[in-house]
C-alpha cells in the first residue's frame, strides 16, 4: 500500500509562543494510507534514512473512519524522526500525526523554557486534536478519538495525556528525586536556567501549570517508548488512577534512561500497563531512525549501536507491537 505524506502548520490560539510574539506554533506532519495509484518518491537526503512516500496524495477511501495515532518526539527531536513508526503505522491502515514541540524541537532554536515545561507538549497534542486544518488537508474520514505513542520525553507526553500528573519537574530544586544530570545532552545546564526564567512572565505562567491535569479522554491508549527519568516526577496517585491501556517498552542497554529505573518504575505504578524490555544491547537512541552515512559521521553517538544489533529489526518489532496494541485497544 502506498503511503501518503503531508505537512503543515497550525496554531494554538489559546497559548502564546515562548517569545510572546504570536500564537504557539503546531508544526505537524502525517503519514497515511494513499490511493493504490499514488506515486511514491524518495525524500531529500538527510542524516537518517526515510522510506519513499507520496507527497500530498489523496487518502485511500475506507468504509470506516481511519484510526489516528499521535506521535510525540524526544527532547530536541523532530516529528520526522518518528518516520520509522509513522510509516509502518500508515502501511497498517492508521493515520499517524506527529508534531514538532515548540522550543523543544530541532526544527527551531532550542529554548530552555521548552525543555523545562514538558507539560506544554501534552497541550500541543490536545490542541492539534482540536484543530480541523490538518483534517482538511488530509481529507478522508478520521476518527475523533486517538491513540498516542511517544519516545523518551514523548513517552512523558503520552502519559500526561492518559492521566499522569506532575508532582515535581525533573530539575526543580524541591524535587526529592534528585537527577544525576543538570540537563539533557542538548541543554546540559538546563537546571541552572530556572532562577532567571522565573522572572519571565510567560515561563512563570507555564511553570505554575505544571501540576495541572492534561488528561484528554479522547486518547484511548498510550505507547511509552524508552521513557526518561522525567517520569519519576509523576505523582504515584495519578498513575494509580490511569485506566487507559499503556504499553511500556525500553532497551536493556539504555544508559540515558535505564529501563529498570524508568520503564519498570512506570509499569509498577500503572495497573493498566504492560512492559517489555528488549534485549540484545538495545540502547536509548536505538529507537531513533536508521542513519545515512552522513548522519553516522555527523552524530556517531546517536546512530551507533552495539555490534550485531540491527536497528531496523528493533523498529520492526516496536511497530508491530504498536499496531497490535492499538488495534486491540479500540
Protein language model annotation of sequence segments:
Residues 66, 73-78:
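Active-site glycine-rich loops that stabilize anionic/oxyanionic intermediates
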Residues 76-88, 105-130:
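Catalytic nucleophile-loop/oxyanion-hole region of alpha/beta-hydrolase
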Residues 113-144, 159-165, 169-196, 208-213:
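Alpha/beta-hydrolase active-site loop
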Residues 150-154, 158:
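Gly/Ala-rich beta-loop-alpha elbow adjacent to hydrolase catalytic centers
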Residues 235-237, 244, 258-272:
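Short alpha-helix in the alpha/beta-hydrolase fold that links the catalytic acid
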Residues 242, 248-250:
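Short beta-strand/loop motif that positions the catalytic acidic residue
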Residues 279-330:
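Catalytic active-site module of serine/aspartate enzymes centered on a nucleophile-bearing elbow/loop
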Amino acid at each position: 500500500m502506498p503511503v501518503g505524506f503531508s505537512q503543515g502548520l497550525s496554531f494554538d490560539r489559546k497559548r502564546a509562543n515562548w517569545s510572546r510574539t504570536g500564537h504557539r506554533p503546531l508544526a505537524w506532519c502525517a503519514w497515511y494510507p494513499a490511493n493504490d495509484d499514488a506515486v511514491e518518491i524518495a525524500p531529500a537526503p538527510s542524516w537518517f534514512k526515510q522510506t519513499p512516500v507520496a507527497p500530498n496524495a489523496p487518502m485511500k477511501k475506507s468504509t470506516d473512519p481511519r484510526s489516528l495515532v499521535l506521535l510525540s518526539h524526544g527532547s530536541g527531536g523532530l516529528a520526522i524522526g518518528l518516520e520509522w513508526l509513522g510509516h509502518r503505522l500508515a502501511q497498517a491502515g492508521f493515520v499517524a500525526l506527529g508534531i514538532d514541540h515548540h522550543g523543544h524541537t530541532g526544527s527551531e532554536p532550542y529554548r530552555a523554557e521548552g525543555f523545562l515545561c514538558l507539560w506544554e507538549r501534552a497541550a500541543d497534542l490536545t490542541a492539534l486534536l482540536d484543530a480541523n486544518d490538518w483534517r482538511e488537508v488530509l481529507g478522508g474520514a478520521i476518527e475523533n478519538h486517538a491513540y498516542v505513542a511517544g519516545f523518551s520525553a514523548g513517552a512523558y507526553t503520552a502519559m500526561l495525556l492518559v492521566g499522569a500528573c506532575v508532582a515535581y519537574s525533573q530539575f526543580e530544586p524541591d524535587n526529592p528525586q534528585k537527577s544525576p544530570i543538570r540537563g539533557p545532552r542538548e541543554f546540559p545546564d538546563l537546571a541552572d536556567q530556572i532562577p532567571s526564567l522565573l522572572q519571565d512572565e510567560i515561563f512563570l505562567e507555564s511553570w505554575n501549570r505544571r501540576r495541572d491535569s492534561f488528561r484528554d479522554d479522547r486518547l484511548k491508549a498510550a505507547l511509552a517508548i524508552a521513557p526518561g527519568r522525567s517520569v519519576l516526577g509523576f505523582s504515584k496517585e495519578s498513575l494509580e488512577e490511569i485506566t487507559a491501556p499503556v504499553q511500556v517498552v525500553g532497551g536493556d542497554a539504555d544508559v540515558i534512561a535505564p529501563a529498570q529505573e524508568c520503564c519498570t518504575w512506570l509499569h509498577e505504578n500503572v495497573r493498566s500497563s504492560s512492559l517489555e524490555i528488549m534485549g540484545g544491547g538495545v540502547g536509548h537512541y536505538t529507537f531513533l531512525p536508521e542513519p545515512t552515512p552522513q548522519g553516522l559521521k555527523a552524530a556517531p553517538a546517536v546512530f551507533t549501536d552495539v555490534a550485531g544489533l540491527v536497528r531496523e529489526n528493533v523498529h520492526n518489532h516496536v511497530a508491530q507491537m504498536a499496531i497490535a496494541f492499538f488495534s486491540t485497544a479500540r
